[in-house]
Amino acid sequence: MKKVNYFGTGRRKSSVARVILTNGTGKITINTRDFEKYLPLPATRLEMIQPLELTEKREVFDVSVNVNGGGLSAQAGAIRLGIARALIESIPELRAILKKSGLLTRDARCVERKKYGLKKARRAPQFSKR
């Protein structure tokens, strides 16, 4: 079988994930480490492989990920979006399934900036009436 690479990029908060799907056996590596070792929490692991499980392509592709920035949860979200985009590049018919389950939507929520005159983004200094 010919080695074919499919690419996808995902972002979440300040994390950026570059995903490469290759025909293979289902091996997942993140930053050259096994994904079970990189993501210790089962919830983040499940979130990350959601597109592969939904489309039943878990055993069909090897996934290689380069991710940086943010925390582990944000990185898992970025990887999830990257995998979904790479799956569409490989098999365009999967778009409807992934779109319906919301896996192609970029989560635009990010940290609100701190404003001057306030202690945090919205927290005002304590008010004293007298």
UniProtKB/Swiss-Prot annotation:
Query: What InterPro entries does the record tag this protein with?
Result: Ribosomal_Su5_D2-typ_SF, Ribosomal_uS9, Ribosomal_uS9_bac/plastid, Ribosomal_uS9_CS, Ribsml_uS5_D2-typ_fold_subgr
For this protein, the record's Pfam families field holds: Ribosomal_S9 (PF00380)
One GO term of the biological process aspect: translation
Keywords (alphabetical) are: Ribonucleoprotein, Ribosomal protein
Which NCBIfam families does UniProt cross-reference here? PRK00132.1 (NF001099)
The UniProt similarity line reads: Belongs to the universal ribosomal protein uS9 family.
Q: Which GO terms describe its cellular component?
A: cytosolic small ribosomal subunit
Disulfide bonding pattern of the chain:
none
- Species assigned in the record: Aster yellows witches'-broom phytoplasma (strain AYWB)
One Gene Ontology molecular-function label: RNA binding
Put simply, this protein is called Small ribosomal subunit protein uS9
